UniProtKB/Swiss-Prot annotation:
<dbReference type="GO" id="GO:0097352">
    <property type="term" value="P:autophagosome maturation"/>
</dbReference>
<keyword id="KW-0963">Cytoplasm</keyword>
<comment type="similarity">
    <text>Belongs to the LIX1 family.</text>
</comment>
<dbReference type="InterPro" id="IPR029270">
    <property type="entry name" value="LIX1"/>
</dbReference>
<dbReference type="GO" id="GO:0005829">
    <property type="term" value="C:cytosol"/>
</dbReference>
<keyword id="KW-0472">Membrane</keyword>
<dbReference type="GO" id="GO:0016324">
    <property type="term" value="C:apical plasma membrane"/>
</dbReference>
<dbReference type="GO" id="GO:0007476">
    <property type="term" value="P:imaginal disc-derived wing morphogenesis"/>
</dbReference>
<keyword id="KW-1003">Cell membrane</keyword>
<comment type="function">
    <text>Component of the Fat (ft) signaling pathway that functions in normal development of various organs such as the wing and leg. In developing imaginal disks, involved in regulating both the protein levels and apical localization of ft and ds. Involved in establishing planar cell polarity (PCP) along the anterior-posterior axis of the wing (the early Fz signaling event), probably by acting upstream of ds and ft to regulate Fz activity.</text>
</comment>
<comment type="subunit">
    <text>Interacts with ft (via intracellular domain) and ds (via intracellular domain).</text>
</comment>
<dbReference type="Pfam" id="PF14954">
    <property type="entry name" value="LIX1"/>
</dbReference>
<protein>
    <recommendedName>
        <fullName>Protein limb expression 1 homolog</fullName>
    </recommendedName>
</protein>
<dbReference type="InterPro" id="IPR051436">
    <property type="entry name" value="Autophagy-related_EPG5"/>
</dbReference>
<dbReference type="GO" id="GO:0005737">
    <property type="term" value="C:cytoplasm"/>
</dbReference>
<dbReference type="GO" id="GO:0035003">
    <property type="term" value="C:subapical complex"/>
</dbReference>
Amino acid sequence: MVYPEEPFWVLPTVTGFYEDRDYRVNVVEALQEFWQMKQSRGAELKNGALVIYESIPSNSQPYICFVTLPGGSCFGSFQNCPTKAEARRSSAKIALMNSVFNEHPSRRISDEFIQKAVQDARTSFKGTSQINEGTESGIGAFRFMLEANKGRTMLEFQELMTVFQLLHWNGSLKAMRERHCSRQEVVAHYSNRSLDDEMRSQMALDWIAREHDNPGVIRRELVLAERELETFRMAGRELRFPKEKKDILMIAHNQLGGSALNSATIDD
C-alpha cells in the first residue's frame, strides 16, 4: 500500500517551539489534559484518552522516550536528552504540538483531502518500475479507507492507517487479495481490531517463516526499520509504522533465540 508524503503527515516547523528556554508549560500534563478534553467533547476514542509513554532501557544518555496518543499516532523525543524525565518532556512536546495542529480543518478527512492524498500517492510511483497491479490495488484500498473515515482527523485515523501499512509490508494484503477478499471485507474486519500483542505475534510468525526460507531477512529488515525509526524520531515526525516494524521483527528475532541485536546494528 502506498501513502502520500508531505503535507499530510509532516508538521510544519514553528519557530521557537523546540527551544527549552523560558518554556514553562508542563507539557506532559498539558498533553494528557488535551486528549481528556477532546474525549469530554465527544471525540470517538475507542481506547480512551490515556496517553502512553515508553522509555527505552538505557544506563546512559541520551535517553529516548516514545509517546503514543489515543488515536494511535506515535512520536519520540527529538533532542539529545540527558535524563529520562527530559526525554519524556521532549516526546510530549512534539506530540502536543501535533495534537494542537491536528485540530486545523485541513487535517480533517474530506472529499478534497482524499482526492489530493490519492493523487499524491499515485504520483509518488509515477515513472517508476513499482507501478503494478499490487500498487494500484493498494491505492484503491487507501482511497476506500479514507472514504470510510470521512470526518475524522489524521491523528484519530492513525492506528487504522498503521495496521494497513503493516499488512502491506507483511504481505498479508497480497495474500488476502489472492483469496479474493474484497476491500470492504478487509477494511471492515481490521477497523474493529486493535494493533495489539496478538496482531504483532501473528505478524512475527510470518517473519519467522520467511527467515527459514531466506536466512538473514529479519536482520536486514530490522536494520532498515532502525534507520527509519531514528530518522523519523530526530526529525520530529510521526513514527508509529517504523516503530511497530521494529517491535514485530524483534519479537520474531527473540522467538528464534538469536543473538542480541541493538542500535549498533544500524551502522552495518
